[in-house]
Each structure stands twice: as C-alpha cells, then as structure tokens.
Amino acid sequence: GKSLRYLFDSSAQTGKTSHFGVTGLLQAQGGYYVYDSTHNYAAYNANKNAFDIYDTGGVGNSSHQGQFFPFDAADKVFNEENDRLVQNGITADNTASYNGGKPVNHHFGLSMSTRFVQPDGGKTNKDEDMTFEFAGDDDVWVFIDDVLVGDIGGIHDRASLNINFKTGDIKVNGKSDGTLLSKYQEARKDGDTRWYGSTFADGTNHTLKFFYLERGALYSNMELKFNLVTVPESDIIKFDQDGKF
C-alpha cells in the first residue's frame, strides 16, 4: 500500500500545513504523562505554537462527550456562563447546517516521538509496570524502533491499545495482540535488541513513535497515558489538511 509518511513529515503537500515543536498537550500526573479529551479540550494556539488546555471537555456526540478537534478555538465550541465554560452544542458531525454554519475542522494528524530506556524489571521507580495506553477514534499506529507494535487503523469505533513493558504483552480492545518480541520477530528485527522473555532487556534504549490521524470526518477523541522512562528528547508535530488553525 501507499506510505502515509508524507502526511506526517515536513514535505510540502497541497492542502497541508505542518507545525513542529508543539508543546503543552501532555500533563504530568502521578508519574504519568496524560491527556484525555473527555475531560480537557485542547486547542492549538498558533501564536504560542502550543496547546491551550481547558478544564472541561468540548464538542459532543451521542456516544462520547469530549472530542479532540485542536484546530477549533475555544470560542467556537464553548459559551461562557457564570464564569465557566459550557459546551455550546456544536457536535462532531461535519455538517454546516447541523452545526449552525460552524462545522468543526476535521482531517488532521498528530505525531509524537520519544526515546526511552527499559527500566529494571520493566517497572518505574514508583514500582509500577511501565506502560503505554491509548483509547480513542480515529486511526492510530505505534512504532518502536520502526517496528509496528500497535495498529488500530481502518474503520472502527472508539478503540484501545495497551503495551505493557514489564511483560511485553500488547492488547487491542482488551484482547491479546501478541507481544513486543513477536512483533519484532514478524518484522525480522528481533536481533536488533536484547530480550528478557517477551519484553526488552533491562537498560536497552528504544524510540517510540505515535501517529494519530483523523480522516473519518466524524468522531475524534483521544486518551493517552504513559509512564515511559524517557531520554530527554521528544517532539510533537501537528498539521491541518486544510491549512487552517
């Protein structure tokens, strides 16, 4: 199939704008980095090249309140009542007439790259399993060392991915989807690193790349939670297919 690299890299493409080094989406909570559109609306602020995070979810639909539409500013999705923000009724349906002439901005993507080290026994210094978790809609792909270890692309409702670095187990929608070792074996890259059972050997260094693509022109919600023991090097890239902020 056709590579989607052009959607996430810095190449010039018709109808595409890229934003590099964007900050502010992930919040530190109890040893984890987290973001959940259910509870916190996120809007991209071009002047700061950062996300503005709000203390309530924005944009709703019948099945999941709190959507991820970062190219729609807060004043488009909220009203202010009694000094607090309330949803103004705009929904994820991309129909101008339904949304009173204000359709939300679909067709965008986000990518994140971070280096991490496998801690002793796959546990953090808080004695918790090191994990990477995602839940949401639309497409998500997770690569480690350029090996596809998490794939929830295609047509689907809200889906989940869990990678446990203590055990090496990978689950999609709560069901087993192999292990880190089996994914590397399928890619014929298991010889590129050291192993302890089905997970990485202690002290090995790796690079995780996360790709999120909203292409369905309907729902867009995202929940991220991870406690990777990181090497200080990360970046976030955002782009809007229509070139809008």
For the regions a language model picked out, list residue spans one by one.
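Acidic/polar, compositionally biased interaction segments
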Residues: 1-240
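Solvent-exposed, low-complexity, repeat-rich "mucin-like" stalks and linkers
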Residues: 241-245
